[in-house]
Amino acid sequence: MWMYLPLEYQVTYAPHARGGIVIDASETGLLIYSTEDIPIGTKLKVAVLFPIGYKLTNFEVFAEIIWKEFKMEQGEKGYQYGLKFIQILEEDYWKLKQLLSG
C-alpha cells in the first residue's frame, strides 16, 4: 500500500529523534525514506503519524533495518530503508491494521 506519511525515528543508542517518510507499510514492516545514512542491522524506535477521520493518531514500533538503497531525487540524496518489526504493542498493531485497511 503506497502512502506518504510522516514518521519520527530514534536510533536506540542516539539521544535525538530524526524525521522521515513512510512510503509503504505491511503488517510485518515498513519502507521508509530518510536523508540520514544508517547502517543495516540498526534497531530503531519508530512513530508513524496518520489521520483517522478528523484527528491525527500514531503507532509506535521497534524495528530493524534489513536493507537500504541510496536514492538521488530532485537533487537531494537520501536512503530508502526496509524495516522489519521487532516489537509492536497490541494497541499499536490494531492502529496499523486500521491504517492498512484504508
Annotated model-derived regions:
Residues 1-27, 97-102:
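N-terminal helix initiation/capping motif
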Residues 2-6, 38-50:
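Short coil-to-beta transition motif at edge beta-strands of beta-rich domains
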Residues 14-17, 53-62:
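Short coil-to-beta-strand transition motifs
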Residues 22, 63-65:
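Conserved hydrophobic positions within beta-strands
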Residues 50-52, 67-69, 87:
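Beta-strand elements of well-folded, non-transmembrane domains
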Residues 72-102:
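C-terminal output/interaction extensions
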